[in-house]
């Protein structure tokens, strides 16, 4: 069974805070800043290579999507942690973009699971 859900989320939030503040030690695969830069570079690539007439599908993890949204919304780093904890597996987030801006239209939708016989399939990790 493992730890209670609340304890898991608290530990995850604490770990992400320490990662964000560059307080983790050891051989980390990526710093918070490198992760942020990588996601921003992907967003910039999409805005440069595609026009507002194109449809672009982005498939990603919740963490990368939360960071993408942070950049799109010009939000604080704390927002990434909060968004990441809310993102449901297989959710759909919809936005519009051009070469200057990304605008979010919807976030974290699960229309394919949003019915009584599929509610148990909604998961977060």
Regions found by a protein language model. Give the residues of each.
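Acidic, low-complexity terminal tails and accessory targeting/binding regions
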Residues: 1-6, 33, 48, 52-55, ...
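Generic structural signal for well-ordered alpha-helical scaffold segments
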Residues: 40-48
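Conserved short-loop catalytic and cofactor-binding motifs
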Residues: 23, 27, 56, 83
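Phosphate-handling substructures
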Residues: 1-38
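GST superfamily/GST-like fold recognition
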Residues: 62-66, 98
């Amino acid at each position: 069974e493992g730890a209670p859900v609340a304890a898991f989320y608290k530990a995850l939030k604490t770990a992400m805070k320490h990662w964000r503040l560059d307080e983790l030690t050891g051989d980390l695969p990526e710093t918070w800043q490198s992760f942020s830069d990588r996601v921003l570079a992907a967003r910039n690539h999409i805005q440069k290579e595609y026009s507002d007439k194109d449809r672009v599908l982005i498939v990603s993890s919740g963490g990368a999507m939360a960071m993408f949204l942070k950049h799109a919304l010009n939000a604080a780093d704390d927002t990434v942690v909060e968004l990441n904890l809310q993102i449901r597996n297989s959710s759909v987030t919809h936005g519009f973009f051009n070469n200057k801006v990304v605008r979010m239209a919807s976030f974290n939708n699960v229309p394919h699971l949003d019915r009584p016989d599929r509610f148990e399939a909604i998961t977060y990790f």
